[in-house]
Design a protein with these regions (language model features):
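Accessory carbohydrate-binding/adhesion or oligomerization-edge regions at the termini
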Residues: 1-75, 155-196
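Active-site cradle of extracellular carbohydrate-active enzymes
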Residues: 401-450, 454
Length: 814
């Protein structure tokens, strides 16, 4: 083969990868400030050992790490991204190799992008390095590659601290001589087969019930519908693969939203995942005549669904069974081996897996409701006495204590565990049970004080509100009366906010933290809560958190269904954010102001000297550093914040983001669709939302993209810089200052990109109540006459103006 061209913006996109090599990691250093502690661990973990002789770099051969070399393929990506989640701490090594070909000797300027520590070698010579890993934002290192005529081996030796969501990402961007460089891989014998397989997969076109390709499938091509299982027991069952060799098209089964196509040639393996958007539809639990079940009937159906799952999957390695066990106990269901699952769960708590506080919280609920005897009773006692209930207690682990949901989980677990064993000694806490109970109680009160005053930081999160709900009802059920009442009121507030943002068939809301389910408002986790309240709505599994509710006396407040169904135009504050919401029969438009009106944000105490790190205020500040700020301002680095939606129902919704990743592979926060790499300026007023996205040179991804699932709308019209959308009586129009280009990644006919680091968008909403027809709406939208001045970074339209003033937020560097 003659070699591949460089990718978008000069990125090298063809690599071989070895690893990750994962080793248990322990460090004897101690620090009660976990923020400072993990920063220290990142500063010392990289060893930067010289690479030396690499040996032959061949697909299937072992590298210097004693891990196999693999050809790396990730459709559309500009990076090697092998990010994953580590429940216990690990030392991570991974190596990356590519070949740059030139016809003459040239010195090439390049930019290395990574969150890891990386040494870059060109033909065995060290050319530059990133000295230590960071959590965020991504690091950039400019360097010079001294290329010789012919093939040049570029070798990246990468090291990272594996703790929770770990960004094992690296990219190499060529800044000059781009037309003089071709890319290959070290394994020349595999290069042709890789090129054939990749060209085949990249030629895919997804249409309803078919996958089309430009050429017959190569030998070794197969496909599967398997993607993700809620039940860990089912996740362990091998996927069924169907042969596709020689086929130009694959006929797809209805009801199968995911298809993975794999090409294998010897030890070479390439995969591409496709998501059939139209096959992902709302799920309803209704009677045969289409009517809704009563609240009590529906509640039992919810508990039954949770009980039927053996253990909630936490990835490929293990599951968390406690919610499922609680649901089975509700039915006195002994059909599964729950004793074995309990012992496995206790082992995970004892080893202090990240999120083991979820298990502990459920275990406490179990003990309050069901008798335990004999060896199990003693084992539970031993595990609970020796647990690490806060980050300043003895122990070394990678647990996240500080997010809004985790903090409350740990606080209430400490309060309840201490109360259960009042006279016992908790060695990691160095407290008696009575002392631990008071310690946890004080922290719970501080958490309630904060949320009552400021509102939620993880506001409207359709993932984490389910977790917080489970923690709150433990406080409601197992606390003294006054605390219980306050916790119930906060729970009422949380459910009221979610109900307010429930629009027709889904939750349409900006969010403090979000994941990829943001694409499907009808299928987000918190729809499990909304379906509990209103059985007419679609249901979701919601990670099984409602298993906690099977033994709770918390009463769902009245009036929530009315909040879901009434028209509203309002704004309110939560955390440091101001949220805008307008919903009616025709459309829903919602956003956060960026920036909001002048106000004083709450003070981040991690930036102060001699601060009391034992308070919840410090924990909350800590969380802002890790999990992103609700102080929305243009130019601030993003995390998991979702900033706006326009929707015609829970399926037909649109939004724009600056992606934090160039593909959907890897566990990234921000990701391809969830969160923003850099926050935009946003302003909402009646039926109108404007956004300005300016991407700094310090960020590697130079485009923004629109999520617009065309199959969800009855009518879609592309006209110059406009897209016009209709569903039933609702209308949307989106204008971009750049000409948008369609892109097909995991989803087809869902994405439009604006390849510019400086772009503006205007979203106009309407419907039959305000417009005589769709044609009349189109005319009205165009008459807003949007215009964007790149120099002054000002977006203007009829009765609308927004300017972009860049802000920096020191809390978002870690």
């Amino acid at each position: 083969m003659s070699g591949w061209k460089l990718g978008l913006d000069g990125f090298v996109t063809h690599f071989m990868v070895s690893g990750p090599q994962e080793e248990p990691y322990f460090n004897e250093a101690k620090d009660k400030n976990q923020l400072r502690y993990e920063a220290y661990l990142r500063s010392v973990i990289a060893e930067h050992k010289p690479v030396g002789e690499t040996g032959e770099i061949l697909v299937g051969a072992k590298s210097r790490l004693n891990e196999e070399w693999k050809y790396y393929y990730d459709s559309g990506s500009c990076f090697v991204n092998i990010s994953t989640f580590y429940s216990v701490m690990r030392r991570i090594h991974f190596d990356i190799a590519t070949v740059l070909e030139t016809s003459s000797d040239i010195d090439v300027k390049a930019a290395l992008w990574s969150y890891a520590a990386v040494d870059v070698y060109c033909n065995g010579r060290l050319e530059g390095a990133l000295k230590q890993p960071v959590y965020k934002p991504i690091q950039k290192k400019e360097l010079t590659l001294h290329l010789k005529a012919g093939r040049n081996l570029i070798y990246l030796a990468c090291e990272n601290l594996g703790v929770r969501d770990t960004r094992s990402v690296a990219g190499l961007q060529i800044l000059n001589h781009k037309d003089e460089i071709k890319v290959s891989i070290p394994d020349e014998a595999c290069a042709d087969a890789a090129a054939v397989a990749e060209a085949f997969l990249e030629s895919a076109r997804l249409e309803s019930n078919k996958l089309w390709f430009d050429s017959p499938a190569p030998a070794g091509t197969s496909y599967t519908y398997r993607y993700h299982e809620e039940d860990f027991a089912k996740a362990k069952i091998p996927a069924v693969w169907y042969q596709a060799e020689g086929k130009n098209e694959i006929l797809l089964e209805n009801g199968q939203p995911y298809v993975t196509v794999k090409v294998v040639s010897g030890k070479l393996e390439l995969k591409r995942v496709f998501e059939r958007t139209e096959q992902l539809v709302p799920k309803y639990a209704l009677r045969e005549d289409g009517s809704a079940f009563s609240f009590e009937e529906n509640k039992e159906l919810i508990f039954r669904r949770i009980a039927d799952v053996m253990s909630e999957s936490r990835g490929e390695k293990f599951g968390f069974p406690i919610s499922n066990i609680l649901a089975r106990k509700h039915f006195n269901d002994n059909s599964m081996d729950d004793e074995r699952l309990m012992y496995e769960m206790l082992e995970m708590i004892e080893e202090r897996y990240d999120c083991s506080d979820f298990l502990m919280c459920g275990l406490i609920r179990y003990l309050h409701n069901y008798p335990v005897e004999g060896a199990m009773k003693e084992r539970i006692k031993d595990v609970m006495l020796n647990y690490r209930y806060w980050m300043d207690m003895d122990g070394f682990d990678g647990m996240c204590f500080w997010s809004e949901n985790h903090a409350l989980m740990f606080y209430t677990c400490a309060m309840n565990a201490g109360e259960m064993y009042p006279d016992e000694y908790f060695p990691r806490a160095k407290m008696t049970g009575k002392e631990l109970h008071l310690y946890g109680r004080n922290k719970v009160l501080q958490w309630l004080d904060d949320v009552e005053e400021y509102g939620f930081e993880e506001f409207l999160s359709t993932v984490y509100m389910c977790v917080t709900f489970a923690a709150l009802i433990n406080v409601v059920d197992y606390s003294e009366s006054e605390i219980s009442k306050r916790a119930a009121a906060v729970t009422d507030k949380m459910l009221s906010m979610l109900a307010l943002h429930t629009y027709k068939t889904g939750i349409v809301a900006p969010m403090g933290r979000v994941y990829r389910s943001v694409l499907y408002p009808f299928d987000q986790g918190a729809m499990a809560l909304m379906n509990l309240i209103n059985p007419k709505l679609p249901y979701t599994f919601g990670e099984g958190w409602l298993g906690f509710y099977a033994s709770s006396h918390y009463p769902i407040p009245e009036g929530l269904v009315k909040l879901m169904e009434d028209d509203v135009e309002t704004n309110y504050t939560t955390g440091n954010a101001r949220v805008y919401l307008e919903k009616n029969d025709d459309y829903c438009l919602t956003s956060v102001a960026s920036p909001r009106e002048p106000f004083t944000r709450w003070e981040n105490e991690t930036l102060k000297e001699d601060v009391d790190i034992t308070t919840h205020n410090f924990t909350k500040s800590f969380n802002e550093r890790f999990h992103g700020t609700t102080y929305f301002r243009p130019g601030t680095y993003g995390y998991q914040q979702h900033m706006w939606y326009a929707a015609l129902d829970g399926e037909a919704s649109i939004f724009v983001t600056h992606p934090g990743s160039t593909s959907e592979e890897g566990d990234m926060r921000p990701g391809y669709w969830h969160g923003n790499g850099v926050m935009p300026a946003l302003k909402q007023q009646h039926g109108l939302l404007g956004g300005i996205y300016v991407i700094p040179d310090e960020h590697p991804i130079g485009y923004t993209h629109l999520y617009c699932p065309e199959c969800r709308f009855d009518e879609v019209i592309h006209e110059e810089n406009w897209i016009f959308l209709r569903k039933e009586t609702g209308y949307l129009a989106l204008w971009c200052s750049e000409k948008m280009e369609a892109h097909n990644g995991m989803n087809f006919n869902c994405e439009q990109r604006a390849y510019s680091k400086n772009a503006a968008y205007l979203c106009v909403c309407g419907g039959q109540k305000s417009d005589a027809s769709f044609a009349a709406f189109k005319k009205r939208a165009k008459e807003t006459l949007p215009s964007y001045d790149k120099e002054s970074k000002t977006l203007t339209a009829k009765n609308f103006e927004l300017s972009y003033v860049e802000c920096k937020d020191v809390t978002q560097f870690l």
